[in-house]
Regions:
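Solvent-exposed soluble domains appended to multi-pass membrane proteins
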Residues: 1-300
Length: 300
């Protein structure tokens, strides 16, 4: 019922637990923008992350596979040319980007995403890609950064990169896919001054800033000619403070996800849902026909 061949921006928000949202009982008004967008979107309320680290979320969202013992596939050697969402996107003439505000050398992210055919946008502080990877790498220059900590540039800045490359792709008349990884909602919880009414250095302030930056991103995107033909998938990589030594705490794997601006009616999906099902479900809403080796399924 919606747009069939839109641009797609997938935002993976760092450590964005479901219990930060008003919809799940939080009374701190930390996420007014996500709450508003959820009411206008397909909103998945019974979604669980596959792991407790960013690389597990990346693995689930791009490869659509459950977590395997040992290291995440993202971190492993010889992880190029796997069947991924990029395989499907390239079949449909999309150009996929991985946009990250740190140096994607960390956790082998660049070799993983580059090895699946994503062009890379990162801080590029001198850690080259493997010679086997033929995709492009674009540097986020110092003059494009307003605030940065050890993890990367602030969410305001990473979203400006997303808009920059969306503008470039739109001018080239080619549909684009972006995997945007944020970093602000992470210790030490620092972010630009003057944006929100909570102090730096605490989780609640980082969550509220993260939400502020998301709201500004959507507002800025709304002004662009490509907005009307762009679907936004906004999900967490994993929960905050979710790692444990002995058992899996289910509550610490509960994350939100929305599909916004798809042309479909807003609804809440309460069926049990995994991160590995997010992209197959999006493709279902887009009415795509494709041959797949993805393990995740269209929830519908």
């Amino acid at each position: 019922n919606g747009i069939q061949n839109p641009n797609i921006i997938l935002v993976a928000i760092e450590s964005f637990s479901a219990d930060f949202l008003t919809a799940f009982g939080n009374t701190g008004n930390l996420t007014p923008n996500y709450d508003r967008l959820a009411n206008e979107s397909i909103f998945f309320t019974n979604l669980y992350a596959t792991g407790t680290r960013t690389v597990r979320g990346m693995e689930a969202l791009t490869l659509s596979v459950p977590p395997t013992p040992g290291n995440s596939i993202v971190r492993r050697p010889d992880n190029q040319n796997l069947f991924s969402i990029a395989t499907i996107l390239r079949q449909k003439n999309y150009q996929p980007y991985f946009i990250y505000g740190g140096d994607g050398y960390f956790d082998n992210m660049n070799n993983f995403f580059g090895g699946q055919g994503f062009d890379i946008v990162d801080r590029n502080r001198g850690n080259p890609l493997s010679e086997d990877i033929k995709t492009h790498r674009y540097n986020i220059s110092d003059d494009e950064v307003s605030f940065e900590n050890a993890w990367g540039i602030c969410d305001d800045d990473i979203y400006r990169q997303a808009i920059k490359y969306a503008d470039i792709s739109s001018k080239n008349k080619k549909p684009f896919f972006q995997f945007v990884m944020t970093t602000s909602n992470h210790k030490p919880y620092t972010f630009p001054n003057g944006k929100i009414d909570l102090p730096q250095g605490e989780r609640e302030g980082a969550v509220k800033y993260t939400d502020y930056a998301l709201g500004k991103f959507i507002a800025d995107a709304h002004k662009k000619p490509w907005f009307s033909n762009t679907v936004f998938v906004i999900v967490a990589d994993h929960c905050a403070s979710s790692a444990g030594k002995w058992e899996i705490n289910i509550d610490k794997h509960h994350i939100p996800a929305i599909i916004y601006n798809s042309g479909n009616n807003a609804e809440k999906i309460v069926r049990l849902f995994s991160q590995i099902d997010v992209m197959p479900t999006l493709f279902g809403y887009l009415n795509w026909n494709y041959t797949t080796s993805l393990y995740g399924k269209d929830i519908n």
